[in-house]
């Protein structure tokens, strides 16, 4: 009965307005009130502040500053084996496994379409049919920056407007096509392991989704798909990120979905649904043995991310011809 009521609220509540309100409140500097809210949040969700670079909650000017707090360098050691891909986020694995032609497992008995997840981009979907996927859920207590599983060069980014359903076990079991319906940012990379998509999925009260190369992607929420492309290879203006390097962040919420091409990686055998993830720990191994080439990293922000690209509502914002 309680679960039915919670699900009904997902369809009844004004999720967009709640999200805007949460984003507005989380960005405000309110002195002692901000500290009080942070302290209550830390206590309720049992947040481990000893891992943060700034463990004192009084050092955060806004709730957003606290929520995207950077961790100490020593708390997430990076597996440097070039044949191993690492976990992109702290959280829990919701589902993982093989993409069955174009079906991705959402929850037991529930699948959704690869092409729908990729906003109907069948050319991108073709890269991942019969490939491998991992869905990682970030709870409120988790570190909310997202990192690279391996070295990668950005080729394409797509912002897809959508619903803002909460993302949790209950909604995954009961809201059809949840991840293909919610707002999301799709990032396609060329890697030593073939093409890789890293998808940042929004949810209720996820105030914003940001990337290190373009700053805030959403808001604004204008209801249109936006697309940016970059040419192949390394060149002036390309975005090359190293394994373990930050690529984006959530200001509240949510979920990261990784897609890998068929025959390129094998997931670590011990991983399963509900496995706890920590950035830098092994996620998958290459099906080939090689020594990874070095790539120059993009500069990383520490606090605020400055936008480098126009976020005007264009369907196709190309950096260069492809």
Curated annotation (Swiss-Prot):
Site, Cleavage (non-hydrolytic): residue positions: 253-254
InterPro entries registered for this protein in UniProt: PS_Dcarbxylase, PSD-B, PSD_type1_pro
One of the record's GO molecular function terms: phosphatidylserine decarboxylase activity
Main localization category: membrane
Modified residues (Pyruvic acid (Ser)): 254
Region of interest called Disordered, as start-end residue ranges on this chain: 295-322
Keyword list, A-Z: Cell membrane, Decarboxylase, Lipid biosynthesis, Lipid metabolism, Lyase, Membrane, Phospholipid biosynthesis, Phospholipid metabolism, Pyruvate, Zymogen
Pathway: Phospholipid metabolism; phosphatidylethanolamine biosynthesis; phosphatidylethanolamine from CDP-diacylglycerol: step 2/2
Cofactor: pyruvate
Subunit structure: Heterodimer of a large membrane-associated beta subunit and a small pyruvoyl-containing alpha subunit.
PANTHER family with a match to the protein in the record: PHOSPHATIDYLSERINE DECARBOXYLASE, PHOSPHATIDYLSERINE DECARBOXYLASE PROENZYME, MITOCHONDRIAL
Function, as annotated: Catalyzes the formation of phosphatidylethanolamine (PtdEtn) from phosphatidylserine (PtdSer).
Protein name per UniProt: Phosphatidylserine decarboxylase proenzyme
Species whose genome carries this gene: Salmonella agona (strain SL483)
Organismal lineage: Bacteria, Pseudomonadati, Pseudomonadota, Gammaproteobacteria, Enterobacterales
